[in-house]
Amino acid sequence: MRRRDFVKVILGSAAGWPLAVRAQQGERVRRVAVLSSAGSIDTSDPETQANVTAFVEALQHLGWASGRNLRIDHRVGGNNVERIRKLAEELVALAPDVILTAGATSVAPLLQATRSTPVVFVNVADPVGAGYAESLARPGRNATGFMSLGTI
């Protein structure tokens, strides 16, 4: 190999090295915050554990794995409005990529704590009437979710 060819190979390798290192780094870890308004504040409670397990398994089925590309921060308000407000502020301070909340009691404190982080709610009877969304077709803010439809 000629000296010039050798130098080209070395310089080319040196220039491409940062790209190779970047490619070897793992995926960005996404952070999901979960705020449950009801239930036991003991996260080892069987019902709470069953709900969390179902959520984690569904995410794993979609390719998300805790410790690899996902971190879940879970808090339970225990039906205490002041505790829920503090937990909402605490979770928003962690800068999650998205916040999931179960129960109408926790939606308002989350929407007061952030105007940019997406908030996904479940078990809310009337999100438009409660002011969480402008309409069912277009929420118009950082909140979206699923309504509870009871039987009459």
Residue ranges of each PLM-predicted region?
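Short hydrophobic alpha-helices and adjacent helix-cap/hinge residues
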Residues: 1-152
